[in-house]
Amino acid sequence: MAFKQLLTAISIVSVANAALTRRVACPDGVNTATNAVCCSLFAVRDLIQDQLFDGGECGEEVHESLRLTFHDAIGISPTIASTGVFGGGGADGSIAIFAEIETNFHANNGVDEIIGEQAPFIQMTNMTTADFIQFAGAVGVSNCPGAPALPVFVGRPDATQPAPDKTVPEPFDTVDSILARFADAGGFSSAEVVALLASHTIAAADHVDPSIPGTPFDSTPEIFDTQFFIETQLRGILFPGTGGNQGEVESPLHGEIRLQSDSELARDSRTACEWQSFVNNQAKIQSAFKAAFRKMTILGHSESSLIECSEVIQTPPALEGNAHLPAGQTMNDIEQACATTPFPSLSADPGPATSVAPVPPS
């Protein structure tokens, strides 16, 4: 009797699992999905790959779309809400819906450009602005060699109020302030903060030093690799542009800009070892960033209220090449900050000292 009951239970579980994994044919006659709601996203993906991301490049629009996912989602503060004032809705599209307000926040300088570029595509789809911003970021990152395939959720309602100012961390903020802001926004640990900053491996600054727009944070801004975590540990010796800009400190390479916040997080005792742990560890940077992005992309929402459509995201190209010191650098140029683990031994690229080219505009 017990054995028969066990077989019956196994059969029920098998049927349930089959139901959960059964795919539906999408109306396009090409794709299938685990949820019919996801079917429309394939066409949106192909549209923005072609017309927003220049046929699938990991370029400026990808960098800016990823930045926008964060600037929208981090706009939430339970601490502010506890005072009886609206604390923001997280990933709710408010940064675009109330662009005339939020783009005037100092921390959001420059996001108006990608908001303007995305606006026509939002109008062409049935997606909420909240969903589109996060979706576009995930689609764009899939163009970058070495990146993880990021999770996608839909079902977020759009914002009805703007986020409060000063919820987006600034590059001149202290480590204390940055860690506190992330903890308030979504209970992010210091390790998760470091993981989210992996986004800077495919990023550039336009407004920290306005004289040199498109200046990358590492020497490979078109590749999702660990060079950002290596190069922020190199001794800073120069400013790539004018110098003396708020939130900027000296960088190790011509053409590369270093944020004060990145420099300090790389050297703070609470984050230095986690920072160093990403060096030459592609599997970790992928898994940690994917997990932290998943948490960030649903801020202000419960995951159970959303539908996951991660299958729509294409597998990013594989990473080629190895972690390295830029040409002209040696291990003596590393500023060891982790007190418990030696910095991984790396060889330098051959040739003359590395000079980093700006990210070209679209």
From Swiss-Prot:
The keyword Transferase does not apply. Glycans are attached at N126. Residues 1-18 form the signal peptide. Catalyzes the oxidation of Mn(2+) to Mn(3+). The latter, acting as a diffusible redox mediator, is capable of oxidizing a variety of lignin compounds. This isozyme is also able to oxidize phenols and amines in the absence of Mn(2+), similar to versatile peroxidases. Heme b binds at H200. The active site is at H71. It catalyses: 2 Mn(2+) + H2O2 + 2 H(+) = 2 Mn(3+) + 2 H2O. Its cofactor is heme b; Ca(2+). GO terms for biological process: cellular response to oxidative stress; hydrogen peroxide catabolic process; lignin catabolic process; response to reactive oxygen species. It is an enzyme of class 1 (oxidoreductase). Ca(2+) 1 binds at D72, G90, D92, S94. It comes from Phlebia radiata (White-rot fungus). PANTHER family: CATALASE-PEROXIDASE (PTHR31356:SF66), THYLAKOID LUMENAL 29 KDA PROTEIN, CHLOROPLASTIC-RELATED (PTHR31356). Belongs to the peroxidase family. Ligninase subfamily. It is found in: Secreted. Keywords: Calcium, Disulfide bond, Glycoprotein, Heme, Hydrogen peroxide, Iron, Lignin degradation, Manganese, Metal-binding, Oxidoreductase, Peroxidase, Secreted, Signal. GO terms for molecular function: heme binding; manganese peroxidase activity; metal ion binding. Ca(2+) 2 binds at T201, D218, T220, I223, D225. This is Manganese peroxidase 3. GO terms for cellular component: extracellular region. Pfam families: peroxidase (PF00141), Peroxidase_ext (PF11895). CDD domains: ligninase (cd00692). Residues 19-23 form a propeptide. Disulfide bonds join C26-C39, C38-C309, C58-C144, C273-C338. InterPro entries: Ccp1-like, Haem_peroxidase, Haem_peroxidase_sf, Ligninase, Ligninase_C, Peroxidases_AS, Peroxidases_heam-ligand_BS. The record marks R67 as: Transition state stabilizer. Its main location: secreted.
